[in-house]
Amino acid sequence: TLDYAHTAPTYGLPGGKWVMSSLMVDDGIHDDGPLMTTAFEYKDGKRDRHEREFLGFGEVITKNLDTEKENALYRKSVQKYDVSGYYTQGNLVNASVEDAAGKVYTETRNEYDGYYLTAKGDEYTFTAQPVLCSDRASAFVPLRYTANLQYEGAAQGMITSEAWNEYYLTGHHGELKSYKFSNKGKLGSKGDGKFDYQTSIRYTSNSSRNILGLPTDVTVTGGDGKVYHQVSAVYDTKYPNHLTKITQQLGNGEAVTD
């Protein structure tokens, strides 16, 4: 059963918004436990007056209710989104799982970069821009850093894993250039700390046929500097996704597929 409600009008979202307020699932078997009921709460709705567009809610709370205890809250997940502007709308910046008392158990933090895009033919250049605000510019807002934390009810969380992304910003199209991963909590949001492994990617394109971003080399390097895995590919770029050869590292040798 779905239920809907209308949010209260605010300065950020005049007129409010019709939203799903609850979801009840009845599996038809009534002697094996209670019905599953989930309630939803929405905060910080934003309408861009300049663009005349709804940018979303800044916070969405999903509440798991105990139907055997008069729908008492026993767990909730909180998702926070960037609704500060047209270019960043919908970017998830924080997600957490909390108990009924508000103690955090897990948390995910995301950080993004903002770029203005200029094109010369089919070659793009991305220029870093801390604040994206323009009537005409094209923008690129990729995910740079993700950290996962475990709290288990404690006041301070412990980083259990981190990921950092780097992108091609000149002469390409914003493809992923490098990905770093760490489960030691020492990588950092700038990606300049210790990591477990790094994946580097190279691409080829045929702009005359609008065939772009075909990966030609994927190399996985450990934090110790050793190459642990490598795959290369060759394409007939006259046709989209026409793969002609794959070479994979296999021990001290190679495995080639034509």
Q: Where is each model-derived feature located?
A:
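Non-catalytic interaction/targeting regions
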Residues: 1-258
